[in-house]
Amino acid sequence: MVDLWPVSTRPRVLFRAAPSLLNSASAASMLWAELIAMAPSIPSALPPFS
Protein backbone atom coordinates (compact mmCIF):
# COMPACT_ATOMS: atom_id res chain seq x y z
CA MET A 1 0.00 0.00 0.00
CA VAL A 2 1.28 3.44 -0.91
CA ASP A 3 1.71 5.90 1.95
CA LEU A 4 -0.07 9.07 0.78
CA TRP A 5 0.63 11.19 3.85
CA PRO A 6 4.09 12.30 4.95
CA VAL A 7 5.10 11.21 8.44
CA SER A 8 4.96 14.81 9.68
CA THR A 9 1.26 15.05 8.75
CA ARG A 10 0.19 11.81 10.40
CA PRO A 11 0.25 12.89 14.08
CA ARG A 12 -1.88 15.96 13.34
CA VAL A 13 -4.46 13.94 11.41
CA LEU A 14 -4.64 11.25 14.09
CA PHE A 15 -4.87 13.89 16.83
CA ARG A 16 -7.88 15.43 15.10
CA ALA A 17 -9.47 12.11 14.15
CA ALA A 18 -9.48 10.63 17.66
CA PRO A 19 -11.68 13.31 19.30
CA SER A 20 -14.08 13.30 16.33
CA LEU A 21 -14.68 9.58 16.78
CA LEU A 22 -15.80 10.23 20.35
CA ASN A 23 -17.62 13.48 19.60
CA SER A 24 -20.75 14.47 17.68
CA ALA A 25 -21.35 13.99 13.97
CA SER A 26 -20.58 17.67 13.42
CA ALA A 27 -17.01 17.13 14.64
CA ALA A 28 -16.62 14.23 12.20
CA SER A 29 -17.96 16.38 9.38
CA MET A 30 -15.41 19.08 10.24
CA LEU A 31 -12.64 16.47 9.99
CA TRP A 32 -14.05 15.30 6.66
CA ALA A 33 -14.05 18.89 5.39
CA GLU A 34 -10.38 19.19 6.37
CA LEU A 35 -9.51 15.97 4.54
CA ILE A 36 -11.30 17.29 1.44
CA ALA A 37 -9.29 20.50 1.74
CA MET A 38 -6.09 18.40 1.77
CA ALA A 39 -7.23 16.39 -1.27
CA PRO A 40 -5.52 18.53 -3.95
CA SER A 41 -2.12 17.50 -2.56
CA ILE A 42 -2.98 13.78 -2.58
CA PRO A 43 -3.23 13.21 -6.39
CA SER A 44 0.28 14.57 -6.84
CA ALA A 45 1.54 11.50 -4.96
CA LEU A 46 -0.37 9.10 -7.22
CA PRO A 47 0.75 7.89 -10.64
CA PRO A 48 -1.26 9.08 -13.66
CA PHE A 49 -4.27 6.92 -14.50
CA SER A 50 -3.67 6.89 -18.26
Swiss-Prot record:
> GO MF annotations for this entry?
growth factor activity
Look up keyword Phosphoprotein and say if it applies.
yes
Q: What does this protein do?
A: Neurite outgrowth factor.
Natural source organism: Rattus norvegicus (Rat)
Tissue and organ distribution: Brain.
Q: What does the UniProt keyword field contain?
A: Growth factor, Phosphoprotein
Name by which UniProt lists this protein: Sproutin
Carrying Phosphoserine, the residues are 8
Highest taxon in the source lineage? Eukaryota
Organism classification, top ranks?
Eukaryota, Metazoa, Chordata, Craniata, Vertebrata
